[in-house]
């Protein structure tokens, strides 16, 4: 979600994968600090028919930003990888597809938790600029992405868990708040899969091979 035009590029790539008849797709948003809100909305729209993607609350009121394209580019299994460094537009993409029940989110205990919009105001050539928080992002389920971020459906232990990363680590971070949910229709196609997959993930982490791998990874870092 870092540059303009990514939505069109991603749409072509999704079509290429469909042509190859892939059994599923994984979107890796780990270490993705965000980017264009417009692109995040367009990418989310590739996986749903239509509907709201994110709510933006500012001084003038509330905007509900939708996916305007009723076409679905891909309807198959979808996983999104996140970690504590997934922030801003990345969190919006993950949150929207989680709220719709369209993707399974996998990763750290939570994403970064940056649910605010900043605007630069010039103070003149000699005085520089002032960065002000002017708006906040809200999921379509009504919860903010601020502070708490997005909690994955399946949590995988990470070295980042012991690091002070995320909005909640800041001394004066803005709080998590809620607003009224947007009107949207959630799919229940993956609801029953998540407990099963989560249990399987825990079982794999309890194997000797996984413990051995983690020991070597910790020693490396």
Predicted segment positions?
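Single conserved hydrophobic/aromatic residue that forms the stacking wall/gate
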Residues: 1-10, 212-215, 219-221
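Cleft-lining beta-strand/loop regions that shape enzyme active-site pockets
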Residues: 4-124, 136
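Short, well-ordered strand-loop elements centered on a beta-strand within folded domains, enriched
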Residues: 54, 60-62, 129-132, 145-147
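Residues in well-ordered beta-strands of folded domains
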Residues: 54, 106, 133-135, 155-157, ...
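Active-site lining segments that contact anionic ligands and/or coordinate catalytic metals
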Residues: 75, 100, 127-132, 151, ...
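Polar, glycine-rich mid-to-C-terminal structural blocks
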Residues: 115-122, 128-141, 148-159
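Conserved functional hotspot residues or short segments at active or partner-binding sites
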Residues: 145-217
């Amino acid at each position: 979600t870092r540059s303009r035009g990514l939505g069109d590029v991603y749409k072509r790539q999704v079509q290429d994968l469909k042509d190859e008849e892939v059994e599923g797709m994984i979107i890796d948003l780990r270490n993705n600090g965000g980017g264009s809100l417009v692109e995040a909305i367009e990418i989310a729209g590739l996986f749903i028919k239509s509907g709201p993607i994110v709510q933006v609350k500012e001084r003038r009121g509330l905007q509900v930003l939708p996916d305007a394209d009723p076409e679905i580019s891909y309807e198959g299994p979808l996983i999104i990888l996140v970690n504590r460094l997934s922030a801003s537009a990345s969190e919006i993409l993950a949150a929207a597809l989680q709220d719709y029940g369209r993707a399974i989110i996998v990763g750290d205990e939570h994403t970064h938790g940056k649910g605010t919009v900043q605007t630069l105001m010039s103070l003149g050539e000699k005085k520089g600029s002032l960065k002000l928080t002017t708006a906040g992002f809200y999921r379509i389920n009504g919860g903010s992405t601020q502070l708490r971020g997005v909690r994955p459906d399946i949590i995988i232990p990470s070295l980042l868990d012991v690091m002070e990363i995320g909005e909640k680590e800041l001394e004066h971070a803005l709080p998590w708040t809620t607003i009224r949910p947007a009107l949207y229709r959630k799919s229940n196609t993956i609801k029953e899969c998540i407990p099963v997959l989560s249990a399987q993930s825990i079982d794999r982490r309890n194997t000797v091979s996984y413990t051995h791998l983690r020991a070597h990874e910790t020693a490396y870092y």
